[in-house]
């Protein structure tokens, strides 16, 4: 895949992850509601936020891109799971925005991970 497209994907995923941090760390009511519903408030909210911060940072460095993409894939798979099991696709009348953002971020992180597969030490 084109290196420029992959760079744009990495930046896009990192921005998506980073922009959600203020909601998690500052205790936005929607974020508190989500993590209360799944039984992970407040420690899950802070923990997931911290993991998303690490994943977004790893995406910015070429050597660690695969780790950031792998973490993001796992984090978004968890978000998708909770949307499909406990939260529902639409949370607090958001029209499914959070769910669809999670699915899109998951798909893009899979593309990044696939493109970086040769850099993964335990696969190569």
Where are these regions (language model features)?
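Active-site-proximal flexible loops/turns
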Residues: 27, 59, 90
């Amino acid at each position: 895949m084109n290196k420029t497209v992959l760079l744009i994907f990495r930046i896009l995923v990192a921005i998506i992850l980073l922009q959600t941090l203020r909601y998690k760390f500052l205790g936005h009511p929607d974020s508190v509601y989500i993590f209360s519903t799944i039984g992970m408030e407040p420690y899950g909210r802070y923990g997931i936020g911290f993991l998303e911060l690490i994943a977004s940072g790893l995406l910015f460095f070429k050597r660690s891109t695969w780790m950031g993409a792998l973490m993001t894939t796992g984090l978004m798979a968890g978000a998708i799971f909770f949307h499909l099991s406990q939260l529902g696709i639409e949370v607090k009348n958001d029209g499914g925005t959070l769910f669809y953002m999670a699915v899109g971020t998951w798909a893009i992180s899979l593309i990044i991970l696939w493109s970086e597969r040769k850099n993964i030490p335990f696969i190569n």
